[in-house]
Amino acid sequence: DIKNGGKLSKKELKEKEGNLILKSLKNSDYVILLDDKGLALTSIEFSELLNKNMVSSANELVFIIGGAFGFSESVYRRANTKLSLSKMTFSHQMVRMIFKEQLYRAFTILEGEKYHHE
């Protein structure tokens, strides 16, 4: 959370949040934004994306949820990929829960467990 964020314009708030996000990243991080304008993947396709990036790279995967007004342009430029969980808008709490479940599902798919059904 940004101190006194309520006093800032949407653009100023996105810029401030963006600066904090960018400061926390390493140059080697593979950044995936959770964004409603991103790629819409099936659970299997998402597991393949995870697997490809975990196997082919020493970089850390970093998933980022945007603020109330989305991401700053600088964060969009830094991102390697944008991923959509839905075209709908969800609260941060809901995104965390839905995304955690998709991560769990993806790893069970990769491990060949019977959690996911086609």
Language-model features, listed with the residues they occupy:
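Generic beta-strand structural signal
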Residues: 61-63, 81
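Rossmann-fold NAD(P)-binding glycine/threonine-rich loop
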Residues: 66, 72
